C-alpha cells in the first residue's frame, strides 16, 4: 500500500468511527438527516428520496438522492462521510438492474416507480417434520 492509500485509510477509519452507515444502493429509498445551520441556530432537516447512484470510493464516496418536491424533481449529492449528515435510514429496498438510475429524470408518475425488493425469509422448521 502506498502512502496516499495509507493516509486515506486512516482518515476513513477516523471519520467512520462511531457512525452507522447502512448498506444501501441505487433504487433504495433513503431518509438523510442533514444538519442545517441558519445564522446561529442549527437544526436537522430530513431529506427523503430515491438513491439514483453512488460514485467514488473510500473517503471520496458520495451518493445522489432524487425526490419530487411540489411537482419538480430535486437531486442532491451527499458525500458519504460528511459531518453535515446526521444519520441515514433505509426506508425500502428497490429492485433495479442498473448502477445509475439517471433515466428516472425523464419519467413521470407510475412509470417512475421502482418495484420493492422482496426479502427471502427462512422457512419455518416444524417440530416433528424432520423425523
UniProtKB/Swiss-Prot annotation:
A single GO cellular-component term on record: cytosolic large ribosomal subunit
Function per UniProt: This protein is located at the 30S-50S ribosomal subunit interface and may play a role in the structure and function of the aminoacyl-tRNA binding site.
HAMAP family, alphabetized: Ribosomal_bL19
Superkingdom, taxonomy of origin: Bacteria
Organism encoding this protein: Rhodopseudomonas palustris (strain BisA53)
Keyword entries, A-Z: Ribonucleoprotein, Ribosomal protein
Ribonucleoprotein in keyword set: yes
Gene Ontology MF terms: structural constituent of ribosome
Family assignment from sequence similarity: Belongs to the bacterial ribosomal protein bL19 family.
Protein name: Large ribosomal subunit protein bL19
Gene (name only): rplS
Example GO BP: translation
Species classification: Bacteria, Pseudomonadati, Pseudomonadota, Alphaproteobacteria, Hyphomicrobiales
